[in-house]
Amino acid sequence: MPVKVIEGLPAIDELRADNIFVMDNERAKNQNIRPLNLLVVNLMPRKLITDRQILRLLSNTPLQINVDFLFMASHEFKNTKQSHLDSFYKSFSEIKDDYYDGLIITGAPVEQLEFEEVDYWSEFLEIVKWSKSHVYSSLHICWGAQAALYARYEVTKENLPQKLCGIYKSSVEQPKNPLFRGFDDFFNYPQSRYTQSNPSEIKKVPDLEVLSTSKETGFSILAKKNLREVYLFGHLEYDRETLAWEYERDREEGLKPALPKNYFPKDNDKEKPQMSWASAASLFFSNWLNYAVYQGTPYLGERLGHHCGEENYDFNQKE
């Protein structure tokens, strides 16, 4: 949250250089705070658990947040009752005329399919295209990040030699970026994926900045310079037990998964998993809400539409 000081205080310039939100008396007098409106497109199979994980991270700031959950109407869900979706989720047709301060698109267990083979791909493209004119800042997670990069910039994905699964140390490459305010030089980051976005193609997109990397996982977090688009290739939202559950699921399906790296004490899957990324996850989501969403959107909600529009992309060629 902002710090109010007397204009001219010698420390102001240095604080602002460190991405500390400092305001003078005049701005403080006119400071108004309204609830932020967020849309979460939950593509994960265990929706109730993912809902809880996302909401926990969104609740760590003093900001009031109104959250809508969206489901893909073109997909038949196997793990979530329709009654739950009818009660707590909305379809795209119900919200397409609304404007949102922020959008979160989760991962999905479909990365081994080609994008066009996913049964809700056309609907996904429609949502991404709509977000350019109806959402101020969008945050994409894992498959959601890979798919959005493909939709917007034609960045393809490539298969990894084996599933990347575990907790990996990522290096902060741009410590002055507001999304990493308060971070140490390194942070732990859960990964669970079979594919990655093509690094050489990412480098060709001039508006994208690589914010964090890992020797083992490659690029881990990207963002547009104006923070209107943020791409997380891992799962900061995961709780302590998520990777353990996925590991057991894969074993039961006969996939013979490797043990998640840097996760179980002494690599013993009978032990309680180690939680080493909670503080980084909380800080990152708080920074996104504060710097990418709250500080950029207007106080008057009805003016949000004027702030959302950006350049258009040709999405039709992907359908």
From Swiss-Prot:
Substrate binds at residues 163, 192, 249. It catalyses: L-homoserine + acetyl-CoA = O-acetyl-L-homoserine + CoA. Pathway: Amino-acid biosynthesis; L-methionine biosynthesis via de novo pathway; O-acetyl-L-homoserine from L-homoserine: step 1/1. The keyword Acyltransferase applies. Keywords: Acyltransferase, Amino-acid biosynthesis, Cytoplasm, Methionine biosynthesis, Transferase. One of its GO terms (cellular component) is cytoplasm. This is Homoserine O-acetyltransferase. The record marks 192 as: Important for substrate specificity.
